[in-house]
């Protein structure tokens, strides 16, 4: 069983307690606008540094396996620090198909995903793919991210979701 959690603040607080998280097989942590606020005076959903800090802090949680849609430009992030943090904590970074849809609501996702993929390739950091289907016909749809992966010449061996065995092994490395 798994869940997508809301990152609530730059401390990496999520909306489920550890005693629940430890019972899950998979936990994805994501920033979602309505749930996220920083303790800063900055009102524009935090700064690049605070958003990056939120991701880095949540990656320290041994029950969080994946960072969901970190390509959303509404929440700017330092991708060098994000990728380094993912490597250090064995956390997967999601390449999200829904983010890349032309009619999507997230901003600058293609540019951000390209930067993230390039850094992951350089640092040997694994990504995971997600359809993030908001309607049933999109479940398992990856057409937008397949294009990005090809354009980035991203190595298949760094894509966690190419086999169940690989994905399962990488998830178990966390913690």
Place the predicted regions along the sequence by residue.
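Extended substrate/RNA-proximal surfaces in nucleic-acid metabolism proteins
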Residues: 1-91, 150-154, 158-159, 165-175
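Short histidine/acidic/glycine/proline-rich micro-motifs that form metal-
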Residues: 7, 71-74, 99-101, 133-136
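Short hydrophobic "helix-edge" motifs at membrane interfaces and signal-peptide entry regions
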Residues: 59-60, 120-125
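Hydrophobic alpha-helical segments
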Residues: 99, 123-126, 136, 151-155
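His/Asp/Glu-enriched short active-site or ligand-binding loop at hydrolase and phosphoryl-transfer sites
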Residues: 92-105
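Short acidic/histidine-rich active-site segments
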Residues: 125-140, 159
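Short secondary-structure boundary segments
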Residues: 31, 95-98, 131-132
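Histidine/acidic-residue-rich catalytic or RNA/ligand-binding cores of hydrolases
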Residues: 76-85, 103-119, 136-150, 170-171
